[in-house]
Amino acid sequence: MKDNSLKPVSFIRSRCLRLRHASSRCTKCLDVCPSDALILAEGQVGFLAHKCIGCESCIAVCPQDCYLSNGISDKGLEEEIRRKTSGKTLKISCQRIERQQENVVVNCLQRIDVSHLAQASRYGVETIELHTGKCSECQACRNASWLDEKKIEADEFFELFGNKLTVSREEHEWNVDYSKRHFLTNLLKRGELGEQKEYGE
């Protein structure tokens, strides 16, 4: 059985703008965190690792690189994009769906930011296909408009550099292991399984 659990990110607090500059009001990571793993206490960002679900949305928005993936690193993701770019189309998949070998795989597609769009464009990519699970039912997707934001980023990139990028989405079923985990977790949240542990633990 494959392990579909996602590892928490690592937080390097010393890099945070709020710590380095008393006047900073940055809330980018707080705004996108879907699990309340990030809190604001006395003007500083706090990280509750036990609440982190590993979606890595914070990595995509933090301007100071405060968050590090415990899955694929930024450098590793860049290498995957380089290696799996074929022709004019790049396919990127959510980890929780069945995917093809040629796809770049990330924990959550909200991890993809404008720098990845720029990298793909440099390799001649004109279309980026985002292969998702059922985002509307996923705990990681607090931001329901994330796809629209990616399309806006692509349009802004075009305006800056003149390279047209089309961002499209295909929705898939979750893979079998994750579907079971998700179903039983929801039962636990409703108290229907008492003290039983989540599937797969």
Report the location of each language-model feature:
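Aromatic-flanked redox-active Cys/Sec active sites in thiol-based oxidoreductases
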Residues: 13, 35, 49
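Repeat-unit-sized solenoid/scaffold elements
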Residues: 68-79, 196-200
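Iron-sulfur cluster-binding cysteine motifs and their immediate structural context
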Residues: 24-46, 57-74
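Basic (Lys/Arg-enriched) interaction patch that binds polyanionic ligands
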Residues: 45, 52-61, 178-187
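Short microdomains enriched in Cys/His and/or Lys/Arg
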Residues: 32, 48-63, 75-93
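Short, solvent-exposed loop/turn positions at domain surfaces
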Residues: 20, 46-49
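Non-ligating segments of multi-cofactor redox enzymes
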Residues: 1-27, 83-201
